[in-house]
Curated annotation (Swiss-Prot):
Entries under SUPFAM superfamilies matching the protein: Zn-binding ribosomal proteins
Originating organism: Methanococcus maripaludis (strain DSM 14266 / JCM 13030 / NBRC 101832 / S2 / LL)
GO BP annotations, alphabetical order: translation
Domain of life: Archaea
Gene3D superfamilies (UniProt xref): 4.10.1060.50
Family recorded in the similarity comment: Belongs to the eukaryotic ribosomal protein eL40 family.
Protein name as catalogued: Large ribosomal subunit protein eL40
Keywords on record: Ribonucleoprotein, Ribosomal protein
Residue stretches in coiled coil: none
GO cellular component: ribonucleoprotein complex; ribosome
HAMAP family referenced in this protein's UniProt entry, alphabetically: Ribosomal_eL40
Annotated TM spans: none
Amino acid sequence: MAFEEAIKRVFMKKICMKCNSRNSWKATKCRKCGYTNLRPKAKEARA
């Protein structure tokens, strides 16, 4: 894929389930609220 670096930069994030902030891929807790339930950023578009 031609834009693999760009895709990694955009999608290699984790989203806090409590406050929806973006966190680094290696994060174990949210940088804003400290919540530990993080999900990977969705790679597929919603319907």
